C-alpha cells in the first residue's frame, strides 16, 4: 500500500497593505482567492493562478471578477518556508487590459521587501 505524505503548510505573510486591501474585497472574491492562496501554501498552484510577468518564476497572480469589477492578488511561492502576498488590488479600467505601472512597480518593490523579510526570519534562500 502506498502512503501519500501531505506537504507541510507554509505560513502566509502579507507585505505592506496587502492584507488590509484584500479584506476589502467582496466575500466571494476573498473566498476564491483565499482558496488559491491556500493551495499555494501547500506547494500547489491553483488553476486560476497565472505567472506574473517580469519578475521570474514563482510570482503568481490570481484574478477574480465580481459585479463587473476585476480583483487581483499577486503572491510569491519562490521561498522554501513561506508564501508572501505582495499586493491585492481592484483593477482600474482606465489602464485598459494592462496593469497600471504603479501596481507593477509596487509588486516589484514588495518582492524585494519579502526577500529581505524572508532572509531575516528564515535565513538565506537556497538557490
Regions found by a protein language model. Give the residues of each.
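Active-site beta-strand-loop-beta-strand hairpin of nuclease catalytic cores
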Residues: 77-85
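Hydrophobic/aromatic beta-strand elements that line small-molecule binding cavities or substrate pockets
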Residues: 73-75
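Basic, Lys/Arg-enriched alpha-helical interface segments
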Residues: 1-70, 79-80, 90-127
Amino acid at each position: 500500500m502506498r502512503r501519500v505524505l501531505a506537504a507541510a503548510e507554509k505560513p502566509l505573510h502579507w507585505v505592506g497593505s496587502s492584507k488590509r486591501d484584500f479584506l476589502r474585497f467582496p466575500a466571494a472574491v476573498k473566498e476564491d482567492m483565499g482558496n488559491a492562496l491556500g493551495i499555494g501554501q501547500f506547494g500547489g498552484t491553483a488553476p486560476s493562478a497565472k505567472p506574473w510577468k517580469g519578475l521570474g518564476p514563482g510570482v503568481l497572480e490570481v484574478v477574480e471578477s465580481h459585479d463587473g469589477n476585476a480583483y487581483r492578488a499577486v503572491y510569491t511561492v519562490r521561498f522554501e518556508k513561506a508564501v508572501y502576498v505582495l499586493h491585492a488590488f481592484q483593477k482600474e479600467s482606465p489602464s485598459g487590459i494592462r496593469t497600471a505601472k504603479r501596481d507593477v512597480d509596487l509588486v516589484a518593490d514588495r518582492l524585494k521587501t519579502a526577500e529581505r523579510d524572508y532572509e531575516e526570519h528564515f535565513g538565506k534562500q537556497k538557490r
